[in-house]
């Protein structure tokens, strides 16, 4: 009986912890499709984000890599053919979600209005890339409470 009480107490203590997790969201405000792969210890299937639509996943911890990279290209099968990639990555901890933005193999969204990473918590910092290109000398890693949603907007307008 004592074991059941301890087990129930442990489950009750863990439940709010696991329930209070935000989402990684990618909004496509561009005129063309964007292609996304969720990558941790393995590569998830290609997701097509059509103009005006959104991709969302609940923050999760990957036991193999520790974090998740949402790899985004402007061409189908882009992570397999050397196309420029924008990487919106996050790492979930007990209290925070660390997030960052980077490019590999070129700047996938160069020449667009911009890329904006914003959160549902106004106290957490934005990441803004005018013209879809990382500004020189700017920090691109930030943190927010783990229950906040964090959104990357493709072809975004400047933050207010």
From Swiss-Prot:
This is Antigenic thaumatin-like protein ARB_01932. It is found in: Secreted. Coiled coil: none annotated. Keywords: Disulfide bond, Secreted, Signal. One of its GO terms (cellular component) is extracellular region. Disulfide bonds join 124-144. Its main location: secreted. Might be involved in the inhibition of growth of fungal competitors and pathogenicity.
């Amino acid at each position: 009986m004592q074991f059941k009480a301890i087990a129930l107490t442990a489950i009750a203590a863990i439940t709010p912890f696991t329930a209070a997790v935000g989402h990684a969201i990618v909004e496509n405000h561009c005129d063309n499709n964007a292609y996304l792969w969720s990558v941790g210890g393995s590569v998830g299937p290609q997701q097509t984000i059509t103009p005006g639509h959104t991709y969302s996943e609940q923050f999760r911890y990957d036991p193999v890599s520790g974090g998740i990279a949402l790899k985004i290209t402007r061409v189908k099968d882009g992570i397999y053919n050397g196309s420029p990639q924008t990487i919106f990555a996050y790492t979930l901890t007990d209290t925070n979600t660390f997030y960052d933005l980077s490019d590999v193999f070129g700047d996938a969204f160069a020449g667009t209005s911009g890329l904006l990473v914003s959160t549902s918590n106004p106290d957490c910092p934005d990441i803004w890339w005018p013209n879809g290109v990382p500004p020189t000398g700017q920090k691109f890693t930030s943190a927010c409470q783990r229950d906040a949603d964090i959104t990357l907007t493709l072809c975004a307008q400047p933050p207010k």
